[in-house]
Structures are given as C-alpha cells and as structure tokens.
Amino acid sequence: MNEEQQCLLLSSASRFWPPKGVKLSYGTAGFRADASLLQSTVYRVGILAALRSLKTRSVIGLMITASHNKVSDNGVKIADPSGGMLSQHWEPFADALANAPSPQHLLLLINEFVEKEGISVDGDWQVEVLLGETRDQVEMLCFKQLNRASLQLLELLRQIWES
C-alpha cells in the first residue's frame, strides 16, 4: 500500500473513532449496543464485509437491526453468502477491528489479516456488500455519511489491492 492510499484510509477511519471505555464483542447477534455507541463499529463492519466479500468471492450482507428491542438498542451484523452468520473463524478479527484504538492500529490489523488469510487483492473480484436496516436509528448511526465513507473506503480498498 503506497503512502497516498494509507493516508486516504487513515483519513476515512479518523472520522469514526471507537467510543472510549467500551469494548464490543461480535456474537450471534453481531455487535449490539446503544445506537450512540455504534458509529465507528458500523464503519468498521463495512470494512469487514468488504474483506469477507473478497475472501469468499461472494455477495455479503450487512444488517442494522434489533427490531424486537427498544428503538435505541441496535445491532450490526454480517450475513455470509449462505445467508448464515459470519464464520466464527472471523469473529476475533471482527472484535479486533471494532476495538482498534486508532486509525493506525486499524490499518495494521487490516494489512496483517489480509496477509494471514491470503485474501486475494489482485483486483479480479469486485466487492459486493448488500446493506439492510430496519431501525429508525439509522440517522443516529450516520448512515448517509457512512454510506459515502464506505463507498469511498471500498473504492480505496480496491485501488490499494490492485496496485
């Protein structure tokens, strides 16, 4: 990854700092918390979904939902190509991404995981992520901004891995 690409990723990530004093963990329901705590997590799960799409060469689902709970209680989770839950093998990486204390640490985690998992970054697969939501808290989660940032991030990841 060249310096310009690293700067773009770091700049994008610096818009979504993780909440202080909160440690999130990926489980059956994905990441669950009050909507006010999930902005950085949703952004980082977008990265996770993009990497999962590259690894599986399939469409990945990303959902914001907790329809059976009070409105402020939200979750963000990934659906694998089969429609099932995210592979348990990827959950520790999901936890690490969500809890990375800085954009620099986030970048390091991404680079290490791509290498460890042998994720093909040769540019012959276009990332495909479907986003669904069922909650009124989408505005609180900054989806308009996040969607723009995620699209920029996906494009950045594509450029990085094609070079």
What are these regions (language model features)?
Residues 1-163:
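Gly/Ser-rich phosphate-binding catalytic loop and adjacent alpha/beta segment
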